[in-house]
Amino acid sequence: EGRTLKSGGAWVYDNEIDRVEGDYENGDILAVKDFDGFFLGWGFINTRSKITIRVMSRRKEHEITEEFLEKRVRNAWEYRKATVDTGCCRLIFGEADWLPGLVVDKFSDVLVVESLALGIDRLKPTILSLVKKVLAEDGIMIRGIYERSDAKVRLQEGMERFKGFILSLIHI
């Protein structure tokens, strides 16, 4: 029924779902509809999580493609440039940037990433590539990406915990 989603939230909880139509795997992106079939948004599903669906867009025409993800990354970066010192900043702030479950902090030319949801974890390599591309357009070359995805919630999402460099051009 999507009460939370209808009232402006970006999540659908397990007790708000009547049925899921068609085949899917946890982490897949699905069209979310109310009980009358009215489109509510695109979101990724994970039946292992109490937050069963995390919505990435409320617009039917926004299929989740690489182009869509680039727009999300670009919008987040443009917003940060207009509002904060971007030398060190939270570049992507999960649901606030419509990339639920993903946090990307920028410290000069190093990124620190946290992924808290299975669906966004699948998209993480593409999103990080797009972050590097968008920043490079402003002359910022990323020399390292450190992942700090060690929160316990990852286990509930069906993912392993991880902490370490996933890209390192820095000699330590």
Label for each model-derived stretch:
Residues E1-S108, E137, K163-I166:
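Non-catalytic accessory regions of SAM-dependent methyltransferases
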Residues D85-D97, D105-S168:
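N-terminal auxiliary segments of SAM/dcSAM-dependent transferases
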Residues I170-I172:
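Conserved small/polar residues in nucleotide/adenosyl-binding loops
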